[in-house]
Design a protein with these regions (language model features):
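The alpha-helix within a helix-turn-helix
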Residues: 57
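Contiguous, often N-terminal, cationic amphipathic patches that form binding interfaces
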Residues: 1-54, 68-74, 79-100
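Short acidic capping loops at alpha-helix termini that bridge into adjacent secondary structure
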Residues: 64-66
Length: 100
């Protein structure tokens, strides 16, 4: 979902994935598209969530404080809100997904 000042992204996170990386886009059974991401961190005490938000911030070139977890703190599917110019962030995400 893209707004003027932010974008919300659904992420399918794989903790202990061997490396920190964005692996592209996947289609869920219900038709939703999700960003596939893996992180080295384990899914304990919020470590994987922190690694996810750090990776997304670094990849998009935004401050870590501009990435927040909106839903899915203990689930594999997570909703992240990234604050900034929504259209610019969406375009950057599309480029990243095309490369993955």
């Amino acid at each position: 979902m893209v707004a003027a000042d932010s974008v919300v992204v659904i992420v399918r996170l794989t903790p202990r994935g061997g490396r920190d990386a964005i692996d592209g886009v996947a289609q869920l059974a219900d038709g939703r598209s999700v960003l596939k991401v893996r992180v080295r961190a384990a899914a304990s005490e919020g470590e994987a969530n922190a690694a996810l938000m750090k990776l997304i911030a670094k990849t998009l070139g935004v401050a870590r404080r501009d990435v927040s977890l909106v839903a899915g703190a203990s689930a594999r599917l997570k909703h992240l809100r990234i604050t900034g110019a929504g259209a610019t962030l969406a375009a950057t995400l599309e480029k990243i997904c095309a490369m993955g």
